[in-house]
């Protein structure tokens, strides 16, 4: 699955 915007925020 492609990285979603919400996932990006969690990655940070």
Curated annotation (Swiss-Prot):
Q: Does the keyword Phosphoprotein apply?
A: no
Which superkingdom does the taxonomy of this entry point to?
Eukaryota
Any idea where this protein resides? Secreted
Its keywords, alphabetically, are: Amidation, Neuropeptide, Secreted
What stretch or stretches form a coiled coil here?
Answer: none
Q: Where are the Phenylalanine amide residues found in this chain? A: 12
An annotated GO BP: neuropeptide signaling pathway
Q: What is its main location?
A: secreted
Tissue expression = Detected in the thoracic perisympathetic organs in larvae, and the dorsal ganglionic sheath in adults (at protein level).
Q: According to its record, what are the GO cellular component terms?
A: extracellular region
Q: Which family does it belong to?
A: Belongs to the FARP (FMRFamide related peptide) family.
What is the name of this protein? FMRFamide-18
Source organism (scientific name): Lucilia cuprina (Green bottle fly)
